[in-house]
Amino acid sequence: MISGPPGSGKSTYAKRLAEDLGLSYYSTGTIFRSIARERGLSLAEMSRLAEEDPRIDLEIDRRTLDVASRGGVVIDSHLAAWLLRDKAQYLVLVKAPVWVRVRRIARRDGVPLRRALAETVEREWSQRLRFKRYYGIDVSDTTIFHLTVDTSMYSVEDTYRLILEGARRRGL
């Protein structure tokens, strides 16, 4: 399980870890973005809709819990670490300062920096609010994680080596 805010690198590391360990890969962010695209909404608009309609998050979480219960998977999700903390073998939090993450998001999505900043701030606020309201989860409590890495401090390779070493030490 690799968790972190938008643009922290969780998808990059989760995909690679899944491949190297011969496991499946599952991303709640990809599902959220595809639902937004299907509805013709921006991520900020989709986040606002999810604030009003808990069924969106609950459906994504139901699917995630179902996938996790089968095992053999690396999950990339902001919230699932808290939902699965008692079941997951390895919980990793990747993080980076907001300005680093916004630059990454703007580059990844091909959008202007200002738009990436506005959408990221709104999305994070919405997630924090929804997670607290729906689940009583405070995403600032990071004590559940086995490993926390600031991805702005290390190269992609060095960060990945830390994550992989942690996985090996946990018997994965």
Swiss-Prot record:
Which NCBIfam families does this entry report, sorted A to Z?
Answer: cyt_kin_arch
Query: Gene name on record?
Result: cmk
Please name the source species.
Aeropyrum pernix (strain ATCC 700893 / DSM 11879 / JCM 9820 / NBRC 100138 / K1)
Concerning its family, UniProt says: Belongs to the cytidylate kinase family. Type 2 subfamily.
Task: Supply the EC number(s).
Answer: 2.7.4.25
What broad class of enzyme is this? transferase
Q: Which reaction is the catalytic activity of this chain? A: CMP + ATP = CDP + ADP; dCMP + ATP = dCDP + ADP
Q: Which SUPFAM superfamilies does this chain map to?
A: P-loop containing nucleoside triphosphate hydrolases
Looking up Gene3D superfamilies in the UniProt record yields:
P-loop containing nucleotide triphosphate hydrolases
Question: Could you tell me where this protein is found in the cell?
Answer: Cytoplasm
What is one GO cellular-component annotation here? Answer: cytoplasm
Q: Does the keyword ATP-binding apply?
A: yes
Q: State where it is primarily located.
A: cytoplasm
Name of this chain's protein: Cytidylate kinase
